[in-house]
Structures are given as structure tokens and as C-alpha cells.
């Protein structure tokens, strides 16, 4: 669920998804095209690919079980879809934390029109 993903991002990075990640680069937020701009944008690209493998699931709105304890995100038991969506979100949030040192404020509200070239394949 998008609100759960936002909480994971905040837990890992101490930044709110909106505004820091919702419009970042070419892949953070809705959709994406071209090449990822940096490590942060690549986290979002990989997250999009992860969701892409779950076409039968309601990736944006399914509510899943998870916990935020002792510095770790742990996904809980649920339906296959819930567990997979949680894992996609957990891995992405951890990736965003690892990419904090190269976060560029210039990519924060990056216009889609500047995302050119062939899109990478998952």
C-alpha cells in the first residue's frame, strides 16, 4: 500500500516520500522512462520492475503486514500478493537509505520531458 511504503521510506531515510521521492528523477513516482539518473532513481526503477512482476496483484492499494523494529523492516504473513508487495517496498526503502549520500536535490522535481533515450529493461 502506498501509505505503508511511505512509512518504510520515512523509517529508512528520515525523509517523507512527498516531496523527496514522489517526483525524483525519471522513475520515482508514477511511471518512468529513459535511463535512471542516479542510484536513488535506480532504486525506483528496480521497485517499478518488482511491481511489474506482480501484474495480478493490486500493488498500490493492497494492505500488508509489516513491522518497523530495531532498525529493520520485517514483512509479515499474508496472501502471496501481500508478501511480495511488502518485499518490493522493503527492498526499495532500504535501497533509498543506501543511496542517501548521492541524493541530488536537482532531481527532486525532475521533469519527465528530460527523461529521454531508450528505457532500460528489467
From Swiss-Prot:
One of its GO terms (biological process) is lipid catabolic process. Expressed by the venom gland. Its cofactor is Ca(2+). Its EC number is 3.1.1.4. Coiled coil: none annotated. CDD domains: PLA2c. It is found in: Secreted. The record marks 1 as: Responsible for the weak stability and toxicity. Heterodimer of one of the acidic (CA1, CA2, CA3 or CA4) and one of the basic (CBa1, CBa2, CBb, CBc or CBd) subunits; non-covalently linked. The acidic subunit is non-toxic, without enzymatic activity and comprises 3 peptides that are cross-linked by 5 disulfide bridges. The basic subunit is toxic, has phospholipase A2 activity and is composed of a single chain. The crotoxin heterodimer is inhibited by the crotoxin inhibitor from Crotalus serum (CICS). CICS neutralizes the lethal potency of crotoxin and inhibits its PLA2 activity. CICS only binds tightly to the CB subunit and induces the dissociation of the heterodimer. Tested on the CA2-CBd heterodimer. This is Phospholipase A2 crotoxin basic subunit CBd. It comes from Crotalus durissus terrificus.
